[in-house]
UniProtKB/Swiss-Prot annotation:
HAMAP family: Porphobil_deam. Pfam families: Porphobil_deam, Porphobil_deamC. Keywords: Porphyrin biosynthesis, Transferase. Belongs to the HMBS family. The keyword Transferase applies. GO terms for biological process: protoporphyrinogen IX biosynthetic process. It catalyses: 4 porphobilinogen + H2O = hydroxymethylbilane + 4 NH4(+). The gene is hemC. InterPro entries: HemC (IPR000860), Porphobilin_deaminase_cofac_BS (IPR022419), Porphobilin_deaminase_N (IPR022417), Porphobilinogen_deaminase_C (IPR022418), Porphobilinogen_deaminase_C_sf (IPR036803). One of its GO terms (cellular component) is cytoplasm. This is Porphobilinogen deaminase.
Length: 313
C-alpha cells in the first residue's frame, strides 16, 4: 500500500514556517506512516513592504498564492495564521481545521520602556494594524503612531535601530519564534482587543478531498473552533476584511461563550464596543447579532469611511 503524502503550502517567513512545521509535527504524531512535505512560497504580502496593507488589499495578499497552489494541485493543505484568513474562500476551498489557540494578546515591545504607560508624550509607536492603531490612539492620543511593515525580525530591527520608541506585536508570534524575552508587557483585552482569530492556526484544503480532511480531524481543537468561528461570524456580518479597525475575542466562561468586539475609527476618535454571551451552539448567531448591534450604533459609518479609502487619520 502506498504511503499517503500531504504537501503543505506555506509562506517562507520564519513565523509561517513555524506554523507549517507545527502542523507537520502534529500530523506525523497522529499518523506515523504519513509523509508530510513543506511547499514554501512567497506571497504578494511578503513582497510589497512599502505600502500599508489597508491600501493594497489587506491580509488576503498573504494567502492567495497558497490557495492557487491548492486549486492547481501543487499542495494539499495551506496553513495560515487565522488572523490573516479572509472571510470568504475561493470555490472548492474551505477552512477545515482550527488548531488549539495560543496566547491571543498583543505585546508591548520596547528597548527603553517597560509599559505603554511609561512612554513619554510624543513617543513613536509602530504598528501597521488599523485595529491596534485606533485602540492605541484612544488610550494614548499624545503618542505618534506610524505604520510598520515586514516580518517580526525586520520590525524588531527597526525598533532596535531607533526608528520607533515601541512597537506592538502579537504575543503568540514572539513566543513561537522564541523571542518571548522581547515582550515587555502583554496588553490586556481591555487595552487592545485582539484581532479575529489571533493566536490560532487554521488549515485550508480542497472541500472534495475527504481523505485529507479525515487525516486533519485530530488536529481540530473544539474549544478554539467555537470561539474563532464566533469571531469570524461577527466579522463576516460586518463584511470586514482582515485589515480593518475591527477587533473580536471570544472565550469560554462557565460553559458559555463570552464574545467581545469593537469597530474603531483609525484615529481613535470613535470606538464602538459590544459583547454577547451565548451557549456554544449559538455562538455564531451571537456573533451575527453583535455585529448588527455595532452597525446600528455607528460601526456602519466608520467602516464605510475606511472602505472609501478615506479614514479619518
Amino acid at each position: 500500500m502506498s504511503t499517503k503524502t500531504i504537501r503543505i503550502a506555506t509562506r517562507q517567513s520564519p513565523l509561517a514556517m513555524w506554523q507549517a512545521l507545527y502542523v507537520q509535527q502534529k500530523l506525523q504524531q497522529c499518523h506515523p506512516d504519513l509523509e508530510v512535505q513543506l511547499v514554501p512560497m512567497v506571497t504578494q504580502g511578503d513582497v510589497i513592504l512599502d505600502t500599508p496593507l489597508a491600501k493594497i488589499g489587506g491580509k488576503g495578499l498573504f494567502v492567495k498564492e497558497l490557495e492557487l497552489a491548492l486549486l492547481e494541485g501543487r499542495a494539499d493543505i495551506a496553513v495560515h495564521s487565522m488572523k490573516d484568513v479572509p472571510i470568504s474562500f475561493p470555490e472548492g476551498l474551505g477552512l477545515v481545521t482550527i488548531c488549539e489557540r495560543d496566547d491571543p494578546r498583543d505585546a508591548f515591545v520596547s528597548v527603553k520602556y517597560h509599559s505603554l504607560d511609561e512612554l513619554p508624550t510624543g513617543s513613536i509607536v509602530g504598528t501597521s494594524s488599523l485595529r491596534r492603531q485606533c485602540q492605541l490612539r484612544e488610550l494614548r492620543p499624545d503618542l505618534i503612531v506610524r505604520d510598520l511593515r515586514g516580518n517580526v525580525g525586520t520590525r524588531l530591527n527597526k525598533l532596535d535601530n531607533g526608528h520607533y520608541d515601541a512597537i506592538i506585536l502579537a504575543v503568540a508570534g514572539l513566543k513561537r519564534l522564541k523571542l518571548h524575552e522581547r515582550i515587555r508587557t502583554p496588553l490586556t483585552a481591555e487595552q487592545s482587543l485582539p484581532a479575529v482569530g489571533q493566536g490560532a492556526v487554521g488549515i485550508e484544503c480542497r472541500l472534495d478531498d475527504q481523505q485529507t480532511q479525515t487525516l486533519l480531524a485530530p488536529l481540530n481543537h473544539y474549544d478554539t473552533e467555537v470561539c474563532v468561528l464566533a469571531e469570524r461570524a461577527m466579522n463576516t456580518r460586518l463584511e470586514g476584511g482582515c485589515q480593518v479597525p475591527i477587533g473580536s475575542y471570544a472565550i469560554w466562561q462557565d460553559g458559555k461563550i463570552w464574545l467581545r468586539a469593537l469597530v474603531g475609527a483609525p484615529d481613535g476618535s470613535v470606538i464602538i464596543r459590544g459583547e454577547r454571551t451565548a451557549l456554544p451552539k449559538d455562538a455564531c448567531q451571537a456573533g451575527v447579532e453583535l455585529a448588527e448591534e455595532l452597525l446600528e450604533r455607528g460601526a456602519r459609518e466608520i467602516l464605510t469611511q475606511v472602505y472609501r479609502g478615506n479614514p479619518s487619520t
